[in-house]
UniProtKB/Swiss-Prot annotation:
Compartment(s) where it occurs, according to its Swiss-Prot or TrEMBL record: Cytoplasm
Main location class: cytoplasm
Protein known as: Ribosome maturation factor RimP
Gene (UniProt): rimP
UniProt xrefs under Pfam families: DUF150_C, RimP_N
């Protein structure tokens, strides 16, 4: 019996993940002959800690074991946080990325700036210049694609101040980028 669909996996885990205070960001089911992989990306406003991801992985594994959807087919379960290269597609992504630098593609221009406060249907973006940083509001509907950028040096304190700082529980940009950009718990082969 094959591994269940992405939709079925999402249905099986959504309540559990939400009760633990996380959002299901994505589910990927990869069929590879007799052995398959189920990759689940989760996130929260406070970020993820490795121990919490490990516990969540074990609880998800128990849910999978309690249903017949997986049959006897072996699979690898991987629970991870979204990487830094995840596009910002939901309001919660923008909220969680406040204080981070992002590349924002609009219809006729590309803007690189520090993400500020989300206000209804627009986001504040702090754009650095020779004369100092300036804040520009951009309608979410006008954004074609936005991706957080890797930063290797500490952000300008004035830019961070104008952006509203770093959300509570999140790591400052250069500190986060210096470490791994994903936490992964692997090795739960069934």
């Amino acid at each position: 019996m094959p591994v269940p669909s992405k939709e079925r996996v999402t249905e099986l885990i959504s309540d559990l993940v939400q009760r633990q205070g996380y959002d299901v960001e994505d589910v990927a089911v990869t069929l590879a002959g007799k052995h398959s992989a189920v990759r689940i990306m989760v996130d929260s406003d406070a970020g993820l800690e490795l121990d919490a991801v490990a516990n969540l992985s074990h609880e998800i594994s128990e849910v999978f074991d309690s249903v017949s959807d997986f049959g006897e087919s072996p699979y690898t379960l991987e629970v991870t946080s979204p990487g830094i290269d995840r596009p910002l597609t939901h309001e919660r992504h923008w909220r969680r990325a406040r204080g981070r630098k992002a590349r924002i593609d609009l219809a006729h221009e590309t803007v690189v700036g520090r993400i500020g406060a989300l206000d209804g249907d627009s986001v504040a973006v702090v754009i650095g210049s020779r004369t100092g940083p300036d804040v520009r509001r951009i309608a979410l509907a006008d954004i074609q694609k936005a991706v957080v950028q890797v930063e290797f040096s500490k952000p300008d304190p004035r830019e961070l101040e104008l952006a509203g700082g770093i959300p509570e529980g999140r790591v400052a940009p250069a500190d986060a980028d210096a470490s791994e950009d994903e936490e992964v718990v692997e090795g739960l082969d069934k």
